[in-house]
C-alpha cells in the first residue's frame, strides 16, 4: 500500500497548492462532506445549526475547522507514510473523544479529492489523483489500525 517516491512527489506538489488557501479549501471540503453525507454533521455540535450551504459558507468557525483538518492532514502527508507520531494523537481523539467512524474518513477523503479536482483541475491529472487516493487510503488504513488499538471499532 506504500507509495513510490514519485507518487509522494505528486501528492506533495498538489498539496502545496492546497496550502496556499487552506481556509477556502478546508471550508469547501467540509461543506461537500456535510452536503453529501448529512449524517456526518451530527458529529459536529458546533456546526449542527448550519442548515444551508450559504450559512456554511458564511461560517468563520467552519473555515477555522477546515484549516485545522487540512493542516493536520498536510503534516501527515509530508511524512510520506512515516506518520506514527502525527497519527497517534489524531486517531486517539477521533476514536475515543469524537467517535468518528472510519467510513466518515472515507467520505472526507472523497470530498478532498473532489475539491482539489474542482480547484486545480489542470494540476490534478489522473496520476496525481491516483497518488492522492493512495495516500488517503494509507491514512485511513493506519487510522483504522490505531482505532482498534484504542478499542474503537469505528
UniProtKB/Swiss-Prot annotation:
Cysteine disulfide partners in this protein: none
Main location: cytoplasm
Molecular functions per Gene Ontology: heme binding; metal ion binding; nitrite reductase activity; oxygen binding; oxygen carrier activity; peroxidase activity
Source species, domain of life: Eukaryota
Enzyme class: oxidoreductase
Gene Ontology biological process terms, A to Z: removal of superoxide radicals
Residues noted as binding O2 in the record, renumbered to the chain: 65
InterPro entries, A to Z: Globin (IPR000971), Globin-like_sf (IPR009050), Myoglobin (IPR002335)
Subcellular location: Cytoplasm, Sarcoplasm
Known role: Monomeric heme protein which primary function is to store oxygen and facilitate its diffusion within muscle tissues. Reversibly binds oxygen through a pentacoordinated heme iron and enables its timely and efficient release as needed during periods of heightened demand. Depending on the oxidative conditions of tissues and cells, and in addition to its ability to bind oxygen, it also has a nitrite reductase activity whereby it regulates the production of bioactive nitric oxide.
Name of protein: Myoglobin
Gene (name only): MB
Amino acid at each position: 500500500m506504500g507509495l513510490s517516491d514519485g507518487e509522494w512527489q505528486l501528492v506533495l506538489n498538489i498539496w502545496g497548492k492546497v496550502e496556499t488557501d487552506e481556509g477556502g479549501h478546508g471550508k469547501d471540503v467540509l461543506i461537500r462532506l456535510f452536503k453529501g453525507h448529512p449524517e456526518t454533521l451530527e458529529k459536529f455540535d458546533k456546526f449542527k445549526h448550519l442548515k444551508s450551504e450559504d450559512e456554511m459558507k458564511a461560517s468563520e468557525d467552519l473555515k477555522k475547522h477546515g484549516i485545522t483538518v487540512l493542516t493536520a492532514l498536510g503534516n501527515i502527508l509530508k511524512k510520506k507514510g512515516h506518520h506514527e507520531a502525527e497519527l497517534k494523537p489524531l486517531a486517539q481523539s477521533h476514536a475515543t473523544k469524537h467517535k468518528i467512524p472510519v467510513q466518515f474518513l472515507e467520505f472526507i477523503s472523497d470530498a478532498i479529492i473532489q475539491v482539489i479536482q474542482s480547484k486545480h483541475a489542470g494540476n490534478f491529472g489522473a496520476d496525481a489523483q491516483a497518488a492522492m487516493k493512495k495516500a488517503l487510503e494509507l491514512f485511513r488504513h493506519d487510522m483504522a489500525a490505531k482505532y482498534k488499538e484504542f478499542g474503537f471499532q469505528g
